[in-house]
């Protein structure tokens, strides 16, 4: 298990089980575990998710973004899923919580 500190100062966990699930659904993320953690810790932007979750976004290369869905609680939180996208406009329609 790994953890990083979110923009809100909460430790966010990424368990081995969750990482296995993420890479099973999104095989293109295999080998990007460090980048996933770094995106939560040092995102370009954070958006509000559908309910209680947050979406940390970071541009990996020109026009290619890594999006991490995670949940925070009063003491800590955890990563739910992650994906690569080029459709930043669809994420930008959401309420922006934080920006670099």
Task: Show which residues each predicted segment covers.
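Ribonuclease/tRNase effector modules and their secretory precursors
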Residues: 1-100
């Amino acid at each position: 298990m790994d953890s990083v500190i979110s923009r809100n100062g909460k430790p966010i966990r990424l368990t081995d089980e969750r990482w296995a699930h993420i890479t099973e659904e999104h095989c293109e993320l295999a080998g990007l575990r460090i980048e996933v953690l770094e995106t939560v810790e040092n995102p370009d932007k954070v958006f509000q998710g559908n309910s209680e979750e947050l979406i940390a976004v970071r541009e990996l290369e020109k026009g290619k973004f890594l999006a991490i869905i995670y949940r925070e609680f009063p003491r800590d939180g955890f990563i739910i899923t992650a994906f690569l996208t080029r459709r930043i406009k669809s994420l930008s329609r959401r309420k922006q919580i934080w920006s670099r």
